[in-house]
UniProtKB/Swiss-Prot annotation:
GO terms for cellular component: chloroplast. This is F-box protein At2g40925. Pfam families: F-box, FBA_3. SMART domains: FBOX. Residues 21-71 form the F-box domain. InterPro entries: F-box-assoc_dom_typ3, F-box-assoc_interact_dom, F-box-like_dom_sf, F-box_dom. It comes from the Eukaryota.
Amino acid sequence: MQRERSMKRKRRRRGIKDMCNRHDCEIPPDLMIEILIRLPTKSFMRFKCVSKQWSPLISGRYFCNRLFTCVTRQQQQQPRLYMCLVAKDKQCVLLSSTSPDNTCFVLVDQDLSIPGYFFASVPGLLCFQFGTKACIYNPSTKQLLTLPSVKSDITAQQGQLKTTQYYIGRDPVNDQYKLVCTILIYSKLFANMSSEHWVFTLELGGSWKKVVPLGNYHPHAPATAGRSIDGVVHYLAWVDLYKCAVVSFNIRSEEVTTFLLPRKIWDVPVPALMMKADLIEYDGKLAIFSHSYLKDEGLVELWVLKDAAGKKKWSNMILVLQPCQRHLVHGIDLIVKGTTQDGKVILSPLEMRSQFYILCYDVQNNDLRKVEITGVPRLWLHKECNFDLKFMDESESFIYLEI
């Protein structure tokens, strides 16, 4: 009797499975995608476990692109602020929120709590560095991916230091995301420098591959965060204590180049540790935002790179803050945190305690605006910590991570 009941249950389960498979086959993949993209984004990771047919659909690049197009059309893109706080004891928290207006962000969501510090982003992904390893986080799907360490070919000798820096970029032609690793060995005052580069493609079976620099390459020490423009990651770097260069890594061709900045960009020789400048995107072009005189004189110098017929030329402009806005920067050491989607430069105080805020500088209209950040957990308000800030549109985070 018991054996007969067991056989009936097996036949019933087999019948249900066959029925589900028949129904799956009756639904075309295109129709399945149109159904899925109307469901909540945060549920996709659970839906991947429903059937073998759903998993590759949700993981596929076509689904991500289709979802992005659908959401962008249906809703107005709302910028989301991500704020990473790292205490001296290495405790790390990632907070985020949308803005109800243009004057305040209220941090309400704690997305992540891991050791590490985020340092770069592309639409849809945030990157953290944990020791010598890189972690990639998708805020929408809550996926966290840790990449293997790079097995460097260069070794620090006695008295030398070794640092590792990561950058992330996207190849818009092949729709590929890649992580770039710069490893530096140097002595005091940037003497005896040696650097190498590795690249990791974010795809199934990806691994670190060493990059062979081109002939005009200079060993260098990275000085700023990376800025990704049209499939190329750029950052400022020092080739010695007084010479600065722009380093460019083409995500598609995996070529790294360096070109020295002309002396005219700096009025006087500035040692590396005193430089107050960063790269930004200005009107679709790479630019240097120099704010050495901002806190004392309310003055910003902007150098825009124009590449005509293979020749790189710099044009510059000087911006002077409106008198009514000088108090926002007077006597305050600021640091550049990138740009918003509409081109505003994000500035934040070098140190923030008890009160968190950013400054949004509209370079086109020479207008500076203060945006407060509230809702930071009380235990962080008077704690000595490092922080970083990134803006990302909510409709950008539909990338499935897999290696």
